[in-house]
């Protein structure tokens, strides 16, 4: 397991109350040895005007996962901030839920890079994101 902080899924989800994460319905669902996963509903909160999953909602899911994964890689007195997010949208989703899977690409002392892949309920890749973060403190 790569994580330096050890939080349960309940504790991870509790950090999101009264935030954009909670408003979008994002819920952390799995903490693996080197992966963090979350789900987000595809509904009126996350749709764009034409009834499809908004690209910004996919980006919010990705940044949420990458930032929390980055935080789990820090020690007391440190925090993580996003510095760049890239998202490539592959497939439209109109309903159901999407699942984001976050894995590290680079874990340095001051910078991190994360890949977040968003899948639909059929397991098809809908969006691929890369988040760069900076470790502060």
Swiss-Prot record:
NCBIfam families: PRK10254.1, unchar_dom_1. Keywords: Cytoplasm, Hydrolase. Required for optimal enterobactin synthesis. Acts as a proofreading enzyme that prevents EntB misacylation by hydrolyzing the thioester bound existing between EntB and wrongly charged molecules. Gene3D superfamilies: Hotdog Thioesterase. Its EC number is 3.1.2.-. Belongs to the thioesterase PaaI family. It comes from the Bacteria. CDD domains: PaaI_thioesterase (cd03443). GO terms for cellular component: cytosol. InterPro entries: HotDog_dom_sf, PAAI_dom, Thioesterase_EntH, Thioestr_dom. It is an enzyme of class 3 (hydrolase). The active site is at 63 (nucleophile or proton acceptor). It comes from Enterobacter lignolyticus (strain SCF1). It is found in: Cytoplasm. This is Proofreading thioesterase EntH. Pathway: Siderophore biosynthesis; enterobactin biosynthesis. The lineage of its organism: Bacteria, Pseudomonadati, Pseudomonadota, Gammaproteobacteria, Enterobacterales. One of its GO terms (molecular function) is 1,4-dihydroxy-2-naphthoyl-CoA thioesterase activity. One of its GO terms (biological process) is enterobactin biosynthetic process. HAMAP family: Thioesterase_EntH. Its main location: cytoplasm. Homotetramer. Dimer of dimers. Interacts specifically with the aryl carrier protein (ArCP) domain of EntB.
